[in-house]
Structures are given as C-alpha cells and as structure tokens.
Amino acid sequence: MMDISELLDGLNDKQRERVAAPLGNHLVLAGAGSGKTRVLTHRIAWLIAVENISEGSIMAVTFTNKAAAEMRHRIQSTLAKHAQHQLFGMWIGTFHSIAHRLLRAHHLDVGLPQDFQILDSEDQLRLIKRLLKLHNFDEKAFPPKQACWYINNKKDEGLRPNDIEDFNDRQEREWIKIYQIYQDTCDRAGLVDFAELLIRVYELFEKKPLILQRYQQRFQHILVDEFQDTNKIQYKWIKILAGKTGQVMIVGDDDQSIYGWRGAQIENIQKFLKDFKAETIRLEQNYRSTANILNSANELIANNSDRLGKNLWTEGEKGDPVGIYSAFNELDEAKFVASQIQDWVEHGGKLDDCAVLYRSNSQSRVIEEALIRCQIPYRIYGGMRFFERQEIKDALAYLRLINNRQDDAAFERVINTPTRGIGDRTLDILRNLTRERQITLWQAVQVATQENMLAGRASTALLRFQELINSLQLDTAEMPLFAQTDFVIKHSGLYEMYQQEKGEKGEVRIENLEELVTATREFIKPDNAEEMTELTAFLTHASLEAGEEQASPHQSCVEMMTLHSAKGLEFPRVFMVGVEEGLFPSFRSFEEPGRLEEERRLAYVGITRAKKKLTISYAESRRLYAKEERHLPSRFIAELPRECIQEIRLRGTVTRAMNLAKVGSLSNTSAVENEWKMGQKVKHEKFGFGTVINVEGSENNTRLQIAFQAQGIKWLIAHLAKLEKVR
C-alpha cells in the first residue's frame, strides 16, 4: 500500500480534506488558480492506492482531449512507485470520446453499422446544404448554418424531432422537418455528428436497461471536471450512469460559467447538489494572483446573484494596484498597450509574459496594427489575424474584383459567396477556357455564354454576377473608401448572409465586417502610394498585413485572444481592453439579467488570468462601423474596490481625472460635498439594482448616472428618484 503522506504532500488543508474525503458524492467548488486539477488527480490516485478501488471502476470526464491526456499523465506520475497501477482499465476522456467508445461497443444496439463515420462540423454543414437543395428549401429562409445550430441545439437538449413542440408555428414545423430529413439521412448512411454521440448514448442507456446496469456496476466512481460547462444532455448522461449507487465527484466554478451561448447550463451545479445530496467544499486559496487582483475579482463577482459563494485569497504578496487607463480613442488605447509591453520588456520581463484580452475578435485589428508598428511579435491564440478571417477575405475579394476584373483568385472566392447556384461543373468549364485560350475567368464568362457552352440557368447566374460587380463599381465610383466598402458589403449579399448565421459566430462575423469599414475610414494612403487609387492602396495594405507571419510556436511573443479563449490560461502581465458599456458588457446583455451576469463572469475570468500585473483600459470614443461613438467606462470598472485600483497617467498627456471619476476611482468635488458617492450601490423601484458611476451638481440639482444591472445606464435627479442605498 502506498504511503498516504506521499499523496497529501504539497496540498493545503482544504485540498487534503477533499482528496481524502470519505466515499460519497462531492462538489468541489474550485476558484480560479486554486489547484483543482491537482485535487482531482490526487483524488483518483487516493481511490486507487488507499481505498483499493479498481482502476476499471473509475471514469474521469474532462472537456478537452489535452486535459484528459494531462490528467492521465499526472495520475501515472503520482502512482509511479506502484508499477501495477497502469490505468489500463480506467476510462479518462471527454464526453464525446467516451460516448464514441460506448457506441463502437454497442453499435448494433443503437442501430448503427460497425464502421459508422463521425461527421465533423464542416461535413455536417456540407450535408445539410445538399439536403436543403434536394428538398427545395429556400436557403434564405432556412440558412444551412442556422439549420446546423438548430439541430445541434435540440440534440444538446436531448430532443428528437417528435419531442419538439411546434406551437402551431409554421416556421418551427419546417425546422423540425429539416431535422427529421437530416437525421433520417444520417441513419441510412451510418453517419454520426458530435451532438448525436451524446444523445445516442443516453438513448442506449434509457432503452437498454441491462447495458445501463452493466456500466453502472462497473463505473462506481465518476469524476467530472469543469462541471459548470455541462449542457442538458451531459447532465442527464451523468445522472443516469451514476444511478442510485454510483459515487460522483464534480469539480466546477459557477463564477466561471461563460458558455451559456453554446448550451452550458450554470444551474447544473445547483441541480447536482439537489439530485445527488452532495457535500460541498470550497477551494479558495489562490496560487496564481496577487491580493489586489484577487480582491478586485471578488468584489466584482459579488454583484452576481444566485452564487454558491466563495472568496479567493492568497498568502502571496499584495502586488501592484490594478491599473485603469482611460484612452481618448481605440488608437490611443492600442498605442498605450504597445508602449506598456515595451516598458515591461525593458524592465526585464518577457514578451510571452504578456496577454491582451478583448471581448470580441473585431477589437484585435487596432491592437495588431500597433504591435506591428512597434515590431512586437504576437500570436492570435486559438484564432486568425484580422485580415485572415473568412468574412474579411470575402469582403476584400469583392473589392479586389471591383478594382481589377483580371483577379481570378478574387473571382473564385466570391462567385458563389453568397450561393448563386453555380456548380463545380460550370466552374470547370470556365477554368478550362482560361487554360485553352489564355484568358481570365471574367473573360471566360463572356466566351462561355456567347458560345452557348453552358446550361441556361448557369449562364443567367454568371451574367447576373457580372452585372452585380459592374453595378457595384459604378455605384461606388465617387464614394470615399469607407462608404464604398460599406456599400459593397451590404449590396453584395455578404452582410445578409452572415446575419443569417445563428448564434455568437454570426454576430462575430458581422462585427468583423463592421470593423473592416472602420479600418477603411481610418486608413491614410502612404506617401509612396501617390500613383495608386485609395482602394488599391488599402488592398495592398491589407495584403501586407495578412502576409506578416505570426510568431512561430517557439518564439517569444505577445498572446492576443478573446476572453472566452483565455479561460484556463494564466499570464504574469495582462491587458483587458475595450472595457466599456455596450462593448463589455455588450448591449445585447442589457435586456437579460442572466446574460449580464454571464458577462460579469467573463470579466471575472479575465481578471483572474493575471498573475502579477493587470491593466484595464477603455476608450472614451471608439469607431464602430465607421461611426465615432462616445463610450462610458464599463459598470464592471465601477464595481472594482477603489483601494485596489489606480489610475494610470502618462507623462506629457492631458490628465484624465474627470474620466476616471466616472467610475469612482477619483474624488469629485460635487461628490465629496454630496451624500452620493461614485460606487454607491442603489435600488430603484422600477429599474432595480445599480451602481452610481457619476455624480453632477449638488443639493437639489444633484444628478446621478447609474449603471443598472438589468436596465443599463440612466441619468436620474437624486431627490426625485426615490433611491434606496444598498450596503
């Protein structure tokens, strides 16, 4: 038997308590940086080495294959002195990989062929496009990507077509029909998409009690990481597998539940406590961040309701205050970030210490350009650079073709974007013509139509496309570059196509197209481009930007990423940019308290990525879709503890004292003389709970600017508003 002390060495009291807990159901509420992975792996090692649980009785579920591989490695390292423990019988994997393993073993029981194929997301979209066309569905009314989202969403909820209520809604009936057609096709062809893996296993357990009983008897100990990210079918899956006798330990953090938009249900943690009568323990000691960073995160997240509650703390240093920088605009903000990174390196830091976090991908462009100007290498983590993104390349291809009809690459990119019913056979005819007659694709259209080489429908579609390009050029000839770009995006059909993409992905694409218009408005033609038109100069600029190589995986560089991508990572030096009302939190969240709370959790995740130094910035004005808009600092800044933050003022710049006063970090004469203070929590009988973010005037002329949790920002006259102070 293994020496118990070896399993508990290096753990704090709370971690030891959970690793060595009696058998049963447990919730480990693990704060950011609290060592949850270590607790999980040591718990599994404890079960094997101390409780003498067979490896084959344990199932450990993670959310990524990388996390599963790391968990297996850590457990094996912990048990290294015991050669007999090779974890051969233990199942460690993601929900999808474990479901796949079960379906392979029981393919006959679920009506699948032995060699069934997994459909990835691209294969699924391609199949749905074909089926919509085959069954004469209008792709404008039923966009293929929205059909993918609908089907996957229903499967994640555990619903088959005949389970869905149509509420006498004709459109819903059509969506159900598409789901049914798609599923029938997959079943006939032996195809299984990712969402199908989970629902099919759940149905296997429901319909085959003997198979369920076999796995319930085998997997007596189930451990699940990142439980706050589980969706409905995953929760049902764990519940049915555990049965009445299985013992389940889940590790999660309700304060880091940030994937509601893709089906994750934060309430699953609460349901687990109720359904499994689980004991809760909190891991609150943080091994990552300084006290100032942690106290800022704690104060921020305390504004959310229905939390299970925890308070992060550290035995480490207090650290620097959280820096708050008020930029004049997004260009000033980007320049500031680049200069701060240079300063960090000059004082002994490394580039790969630094991360720039933003709410939306569209925000990356101005930061990228500032880093390029300063010759600071960077990498877009988990994504592509701005000018490499699909929707940007689509829009630029239209502009390139308008600018130059000889551009065959641009022609091929947009000829069927949006779809025009021009098939591969038609394109092959055009390509052959370009080879045989040494002409461009644009010219090949003229030849093919004049010589009747094409079917009437294809010929009509190609001529209409040429008419579109010609009219776009004619209509925009006298427009400034930004207006031309805006017009082309709108009238080419790109904007409408991406608008129909359901969910966050479509919204991000639209934001990126809007940012492209902003980029054209800000573009200044260089002195060495006098002979070029403004459009040609911009297209050259975009090509050069896209051609800049990202830093190699082994090169020290700044990491840039969305806040969602940052989850699970940590960096000594973190910049959170664009922390403004309407951007972060987003305007969309103002109408839904639940969505606003998820935005706050996202801010909490961002703050807790920082180990040593955190800077939060906002721009007083920002160009969005080529329009300059005034912005207020985010309510999230107002919710930070004043003793933990500090305004950043740069030498030689105009003071921004009044800007930061809006978020309550500096005193304001009228506020001092007044009973109302920035940062004061209040309750209004109509608008609900909020935070005072600005105070103007005095006595009966006092006006308060309040960021309400559910109603957004409003100005109220203090003595008429009937506000209740909340402590």
Curated annotation (Swiss-Prot):
Residues that coordinate or bind ATP: 33-38, 288
Keywords: ATP-binding, DNA damage, DNA repair, DNA replication, DNA-binding, Helicase, Hydrolase, Isomerase, Nucleotide-binding
GO biological process: DNA replication; recombinational repair
Reaction(s) catalysed (UniProt annotation): Couples ATP hydrolysis with the unwinding of duplex DNA by translocating in the 3'-5' direction; ATP + H2O = ADP + phosphate + H(+)
Any Pfam family the entry gives: UvrD-helicase
GO cellular component: cytosol; DNA helicase complex
Domain UvrD-like helicase ATP-binding residues, every copy: 9-290
GO terms, molecular function: 3'-5' DNA helicase activity; ATP binding; ATP hydrolysis activity; DNA binding; identical protein binding
Enzyme Commission numbers on file: 5.6.2.4
EC class of the enzyme, as a word: isomerase
PROSITE patterns documented for this protein: UVRD_HELICASE_ATP_BIND, UVRD_HELICASE_CTER
Domain UvrD-like helicase C-terminal: 291-568
Family: Belongs to the helicase family. UvrD subfamily.
Protein name, per record: DNA helicase II
